[in-house]
């Protein structure tokens, strides 16, 4: 009977550990999902910046063309063209930087997705393990109840003798 109690207590301890691990995995999953959400927001922001920079670059390139055609004075034309060329260079550099950040963020999002999937599988595994342990605990409790009832009957029969 003591062994049965020890087994039940051990099963309860295992169940408690499984529940704790499942809760920890769920917390980690929530954290990873939050990180994923933040990375998605960052990705969207960088995408908008990249699109804006591309649009601005196209506008400046068009403006550069128009200024070159309209300018009568070579000195003025040269100065304005240099300024616009410099702006174009800066925008191209900014576009390259944004593209790099976009690629990095995309890779980080992919890695975060992989982590989230891993933790989801781990949570499911721990939940199945917990369910199995709970079922075993119920079975052992039923066995304990039956054995105790039989023991009480035997004890009662012995007392009646």
UniProtKB/Swiss-Prot annotation:
It is found in: Cytoplasm, Cytoskeleton. Gene3D superfamilies: 1.20.5.170, 1.20.5.340. The keyword Coiled coil applies. GO terms for cellular component: actin cortical patch; actin filament; actomyosin contractile ring; cell division site; cytoplasm; formin-nucleated actin cable; mating projection actin fusion focus; mating projection tip. Forms part of the F-actin contractile ring during cytokinesis. Keywords: Coiled coil, Cytoplasm, Cytoskeleton, Repeat. Homodimer. InterPro entries: Tropomyosin (IPR000533). Residues 40-52 have a biased composition (Basic and acidic residues). The molecule is in a coiled coil structure that is formed by 2 polypeptide chains. The sequence exhibits a prominent seven-residues periodicity. Residues 40-65, 107-134 are annotated as: Disordered. Residues 1-161 form a coiled coil. GO terms for molecular function: actin filament binding; actin lateral binding. This is Tropomyosin. GO terms for biological process: actin cortical patch organization; actin filament organization; mitotic actomyosin contractile ring assembly; mitotic actomyosin contractile ring contraction; mitotic cytokinesis; plasma membrane fusion involved in cytogamy. The keyword Thylakoid does not apply. The gene is cdc8.
């Amino acid at each position: 009977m003591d062994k049965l109690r020890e087994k039940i207590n051990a099963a309860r301890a295992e169940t408690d550990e499984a529940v704790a691990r499942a809760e920890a995995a769920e917390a980690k999953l929530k954290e990873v999902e939050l990180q994923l959400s933040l990375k998605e927001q960052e990705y969207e922001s960088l995408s908008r910046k990249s699109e804006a920079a591309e649009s601005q670059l196209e506008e400046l390139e068009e403006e550069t063309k128009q200024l070159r055609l309209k300018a009568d004075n070579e000195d003025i034309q040269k100065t304005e063209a240099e300024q616009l060329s410099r702006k174009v260079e800066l925008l191209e550099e900014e576009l390259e930087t944004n593209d790099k950040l976009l690629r990095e963020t995309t890779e980080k999002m992919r890695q975060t997705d992989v982590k989230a999937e891993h933790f989801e599988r781990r949570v499911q595994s721990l939940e199945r393990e917990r369910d199995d342990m709970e079922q075993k605990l119920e079975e052992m409790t039923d066995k304990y109840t039956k054995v105790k009832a039989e023991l009480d009957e035997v004890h009662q029969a012995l007392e009646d003798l």
